[in-house]
């Protein structure tokens, strides 16, 4: 690194050269040197949550007199610049770092301190007017501020992205269920023909699954809204002023619009990440629902001539580089793949959540990275599936009727009239001889044509009343 392009910063390990045009300081530079691992960077959503916490803390520290007003206002201005996306390149650290997130906390402290110093007419580096630890990090420890940022980021991702997209997809499918209420079709269990239902009932099942998934996810929010800040190093609150935790939680609630509160037990809040594990469990549950929905849509649209072909889906792009005219269920494929990724992420989050030792969980960056990735994947995936697939689902009525008329399981309607064994005999004989159920039932002398027409009415077998 050319001496013309660097400045020297110091930490407790001594001096280190830092790129002159960067706002970060010594500890960030050491992390870049010591943890050049893979390409995953700390999510910007987490960085912005951490900056929000710093902003709220600065307000409270000015209010309680522990931070000079001039410094506090400069920190807040610097924080607002970061929140506006002006300094994204100043947060280069890898997810794969210290398990407490200390290096990212210090990265944030250094950037805000150097920028605040500039805003006060000072310099970056040793002669800065705002100190990263004494001012920006006042009343905090990485051990409480990082999990607080994790909670803030998780609540935002779930409430502002995942839940709205879940509702939007649910509403589109609910509209389809109503539109298809009178389309009687073959049911299928074990991938085999079963008794009839309506396409509306089938899609309505998807809607109910999504409603339950939404409820499960919403029920994880109260625990996520409990913030670790104020526990400082081990949960005792050492060096945090009285009332500090409560006031910062109030400030964060005001800044975000989410009802954050201080955690009633800071030892739990630092030593464990149970709220995030449980939230990700609900995300995994949503992924399982979406996987099932996407897979059923894929199967029901299979064809167009040799598959089930009971529904049609939008044709968005060519499907094959060798087979002309082929169109594939690409939205279902993308959605099922990302759901598989979320399921894999859940394993990592679970292991991370189980890996606390004594007073601190040290898998926090892993948990945050995977949870925020899962939220992004699910929100984007639901939006894409809704806009490019679900809104265009339509029944292929001729094919549905053809499959329905060929189904041997319509014979189930005869059970109350001729008994299970006789009904089974009709189905097996018709399947063996390639004849219709009606032809076989009459030939076997078990029913008259009039009785068959009266008793075997698919629309009466669905429980649908109008």
From Swiss-Prot:
Domain of life of the organism encoding this protein: Bacteria
Gene3D superfamilies registered for this protein in UniProt: Fumarase/aspartase (C-terminal domain) (1.10.40.30), Fumarase/aspartase (Central domain) (1.20.200.10), Fumarase/aspartase (N-terminal domain) (1.10.275.10)
Gene Ontology MF terms: fumarate hydratase activity
Note: There are 2 substrate-binding sites: the catalytic A site, and the non-catalytic B site that may play a role in the transfer of substrate or product between the active site and the solvent. Alternatively, the B site may bind allosteric effectors.
Region entry Disordered, spans: 122-143
EC code(s) of this entry: 4.2.1.2
Active site: 190, 320
Keyword NAD: no
Record text on subunit structure and interactions: Homotetramer.
GO biological process: fumarate metabolic process; malate metabolic process; tricarboxylic acid cycle
Keywords associated with the record: Cytoplasm, Lyase, Tricarboxylic acid cycle
Name of the protein this chain belongs to: Fumarate hydratase class II
Catalytic activity: (S)-malate = fumarate + H2O
